[in-house]
Amino acid sequence: MADRLTQLQDAVNSLADQFCNAIGVLQQCGPPASFNNIQTAINKDQPANPTEEYAQLFAALIARTAKDIDVLIDSLPSEESTAALQAASLYKLEEENHEAATCLEDVVYRGDMLLEKIQSALADIAQSQLKTRSGTHSQSLPDS
């Protein structure tokens, strides 16, 4: 996962892309300007233009990206953050990391126990198959 500044940079780049795409699509799909009722007869023959739908779509995308940028900015550490606050935050993160490591060790231990049981069961199955095959071979051999 990228750090917050990289995420913020990516979000700003995405916002710029959305602005460029919105301008391009709206320019391409926009109705032509009318000049003193000359274009009205031509415009009536053309199908309905989805410009309004595009405008709403791009407005929603731009608004969502702007909100994401605000959230990322709010999550950045402020200049008012003192060393004591940063140390407390770091201590809390270390505790959470320790708890997660303990949980992970427990899961790995249980996984190892299950693996041993599975390997033991597979070994028993293999032994049973070998005994069955050797018993079948000895029965199929004619006595001379």
Curated annotation (Swiss-Prot):
It comes from the Eukaryota. Its main location: nucleus. It is found in: Nucleus. One of its GO terms (cellular component) is ubiquitin ligase complex. Keywords: Activator, Nucleus, Transcription, Transcription regulation. Transmembrane segments: none annotated. One of its GO terms (biological process) is somatic stem cell population maintenance. One of its GO terms (molecular function) is DNA-directed RNA polymerase activity. The keyword rRNA processing does not apply. Component of the Mediator complex, a coactivator involved in the regulated transcription of nearly all RNA polymerase II-dependent genes. Mediator functions as a bridge to convey information from gene-specific regulatory proteins to the basal RNA polymerase II transcription machinery. Mediator is recruited to promoters by direct interactions with regulatory proteins and serves as a scaffold for the assembly of a functional preinitiation complex with RNA polymerase II and the general transcription factors. Belongs to the Mediator complex subunit 21 family. Interacts with PPARG. Component of the Mediator complex, which is composed of MED1, MED4, MED6, MED7, MED8, MED9, MED10, MED11, MED12, MED13, MED13L, MED14, MED15, MED16, MED17, MED18, MED19, MED20, MED21, MED22, MED23, MED24, MED25, MED26, MED27, MED29, MED30, MED31, CCNC, CDK8 and CDC2L6/CDK11. The MED12, MED13, CCNC and CDK8 subunits form a distinct module termed the CDK8 module. Mediator containing the CDK8 module is less active than Mediator lacking this module in supporting transcriptional activation. This is Mediator of RNA polymerase II transcription subunit 21. It comes from Homo sapiens (Human). The gene is MED21.
